[in-house]
């Protein structure tokens, strides 16, 4: 395994950082946080024009045909800049589910729109979503909590369980987010992150909306979730790297007791420990991305990366607030932007404890 970046990946990382430093300072992040949509359409369109929304999609679906590692490089910079919007939800998770499905009609209908930013697709995977059959196709009913960006989504992919007496496993269906009998209620969240309760009231769906076949959606869902976890870990890594840079800069500038606080051993240890944590997390994240790119089993590697990213989130939050001290707990300071998003990422797709349990189970086998 060679985790050094290719020349193209280095260019992608550098140009992404330059673009985001100019187009997405923390003032833009704060503006998006206060908005109803949770993202800024102008910035979204600019990222689409750069090809970022279709990095890992094939060219025949409007993407640029990059690898998961390419996407990981990009999202490390996206996380570093706290870029708001449904990139992970639509451009990674939903796009991958569609790409893995055997439904060519839905691929052609949705993937080009995801890549050019005109469509936003989200995922609902609550335990209370059920599908059953009727004379014309299937019926979707139930509700799902924590559906990200449902308020601005054009389509919702629903991961459903079978109703009593129906098929034996998960069925994936795609529905128009503005269809009748779909009700969306915004939920309270950290950093005003746009999550919704989505309710589906016995919606009739044709078989053309089924992704991957009746009761055959679990493999596509699991594969997409693995890739999404790697990308989310890359975002966490980028945020932690930026926090490290912030605290090192501040420690060198802040003078107390007649000298910079960077000369105090306790502060040095905080910064050094965070540097080690960032580097070790980066190795695990890129290892998981590499294995998935090689079509190798990566369940354990993804769980290790996710667990380490969760621990890194806490390390970065603790180091940042400890070095910046009291001012970092105010909403005016940028540190709270990083710590609030760290908590969201740690809880998403299974928290640190869950993934440590997954690793333990694998070791015991």
Label the predicted regions.
Residues 1-82, 101-105, 117, 133, ...:
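Alpha-helical interface subdomain recognition
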Residues 51, 75-79, 175-179, 203-204:
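Short Ser/Thr-interspersed hydrophobic loop/turn segments at strand-loop and sheet-helix junctions
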Residues 83-104:
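N-terminal glycine-rich flavin-associated loop
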Residues 90, 113-115, 131-133, 148-152, ...:
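Solvent-exposed alpha-helices and their adjacent loops that cap or buttress functional pockets
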Residues 94, 117-119, 152-154, 168-169, ...:
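A generic structural signal for well-ordered coil/turn residues at beta-strand boundaries
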Residues 124, 137, 143-182:
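A short core secondary-structure module
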Residues 128-141, 296:
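Cytochrome P450 C-terminal beta-domain/meander region
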Residues 146-147, 176-213:
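Flexible, small-/acidic-enriched active-site or ligand-binding loops
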């Amino acid at each position: 395994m060679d985790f050094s970046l290719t020349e193209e990946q280095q260019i992608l990382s550098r140009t992404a950082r330059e673009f985001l430093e100019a187009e997405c300072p923390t003032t833009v992040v704060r503006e998006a946080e206060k908005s109803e949509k949770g993202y800024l359409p102008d910035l979204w369109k600019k990222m689409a024009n750069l090809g970022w929304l279709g990095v890992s999609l094939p060219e025949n679906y409007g993407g640029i045909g990059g690898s998961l590692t390419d996407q990981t490089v990009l999202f490390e910079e996206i996380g570093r800049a706290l870029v708001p919007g449904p990139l992970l939800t639509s451009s990674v998770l939903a796009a991958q589910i569609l790409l893995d499905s055997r439904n060519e009609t839905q691929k052609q209908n949705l993937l080009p729109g995801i890549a050019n930013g005109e469509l936003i697709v989200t995922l609902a995977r609550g335990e209370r979503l059920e599908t059953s059959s009727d004379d014309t196709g299937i019926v979707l009913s139930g509700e799902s909590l924590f559906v990200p960006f449902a308020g601005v989504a054009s389509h919702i992919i629903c991961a459903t369980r079978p109703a009593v007496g129906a098929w034996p496993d998960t069925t994936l269906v795609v529905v128009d987010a503005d269809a009748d009998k779909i009700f969306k209620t915004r939920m309270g969240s950290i950093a005003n992150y746009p999550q919704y309760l989505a309710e589906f009231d016995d919606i009739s769906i044709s078989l053309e909306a089924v992704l991957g076949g009746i009761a055959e959606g679990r493999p596509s869902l699991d594969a997409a979730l693995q890739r999404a976890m790697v990308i989310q870990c890359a975002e966490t890594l980028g945020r932690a790297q930026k926090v490290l840079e912030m605290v090192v800069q501040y420690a060198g500038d802040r003078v107390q007791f007649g000298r910079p606080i960077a000369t105090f051993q306790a502060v040095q240890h905080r910064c050094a420990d965070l540097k080690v944590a960032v580097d070790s997390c980066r190795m695990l994240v890129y290892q998981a991305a590499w294995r998935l790119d090689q079509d190798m089993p990566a369940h354990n590697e993804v769980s290790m990366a996710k667990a380490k990213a969760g621990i890194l989130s806490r390390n970065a939050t603790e180091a940042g607030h400890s070095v910046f001290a009291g001012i970092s707990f105010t909403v005016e300071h940028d540190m709270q932007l990083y710590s609030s998003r760290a908590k969201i990422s740690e809880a998403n797709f299974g928290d640190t404890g869950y993934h440590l349990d997954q690793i333990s189970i694998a070791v015991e086998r």
